[in-house]
Structure formats: structure tokens, C-alpha cells
A protein has these predicted regions:
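Charge-rich, low-complexity N-terminal segments
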Residues: 2-127
Length: 127
């Protein structure tokens, strides 16, 4: 059996937030041109090798603490007014989350954001 320190693992933490937005590029009269809201689901994935002593890549409490600040900046907000997002598309929100999380989560591997009720999502891997 391989040693745990030789294994690379992907671990993740999910969170949700509620927010409103409109898409400035949507044609007049299109539903996305008007303010509307969504329930968003986010999965933050980290890649790394487990510590041989603890067996952990990262403690989930530490990951949750890093995520809390980013979530707070989005939950029950009007996304068009958040500095750094630009047009509030799934793509731009994923990039915004990445830039907020990376300083606290250097092993960040992936940000997956979706609107489950719309069956739409975006995965950003920092490239």
C-alpha cells in the first residue's frame, strides 16, 4: 500500500449564497437585463498531499474560515455593485472568488460555481 505522504488528494468544501444581479450586456427586454436573484452553490477544491502525522491535506475548519470572508462578501448582495467582479457572470464571480481565496488557500485547485435551479455552472482552475 502506498504511503499517505506519496498520495495527492483533492478535498473540497461547499457553500451557498443568495444574491441579485442583472447583465448589462443583455438586450433590452431580455429577462437578464432586469434585476433578478439566484441561489448560488460553490465548491472550493484544494489539491495536496496529506500530512503524514495528521492525515489531513488541510483542516476543514481552516478552509471554512477562509471561505467565510468571501461568502460574506457575496451573500444577500447586489453583485453589480461589488468591486472587482465587473459584469456579474458565473465566470467573473468564479475569478473573483479565486482571487479572494488564493492568498489564504495557496493549494487552491478549483472553484466551481453553479446556479442549480438553472442547471448552469462554471469551473475555474486559475488559468
Amino acid at each position: 500500500m502506498p504511503h499517505i505522504e506519496d498520495m495527492t488528494m483533492l478535498i473540497y468544501k461547499d457553500f451557498t449564497f443568495e444574491a441579485a444581479h442583472f447583465l448589462p450586456s443583455a438586450p433590452p427586454g431580455h429577462p437578464n437585463s432586469r434585476i433578478h436573484g439566484h441561489s448560488f452553490h460553490v465548491r472550493v477544491t484544494i489539491e495536496g498531499k496529506p500530512d503524514p502525522k495528521t492525515g489531513l491535506v488541510v483542516h476543514f475548519d481552516d478552509l471554512a474560515a477562509a471561505i467565510a470572508d468571501a461568502r460574506e462578501g457575496l451573500d444577500h448582495q447586489f453583485l453589480n455593485e461589488i468591486d472587482g467582479i465587473g459584469a456579474p457572470t458565473l465566470e467573473n464571480i468564479a475569478i473573483w472568488l479565486w482571487s479572494r481565496l488564493l492568498p489564504q488557500v495557496p493549494a487552491l485547485s478549483e472553484v466551481h460555481i453553479s446556479r442549480p435551479s438553472c442547471h448552469e455552472g462554471c469551473i475555474y482552475r486559475g488559468k
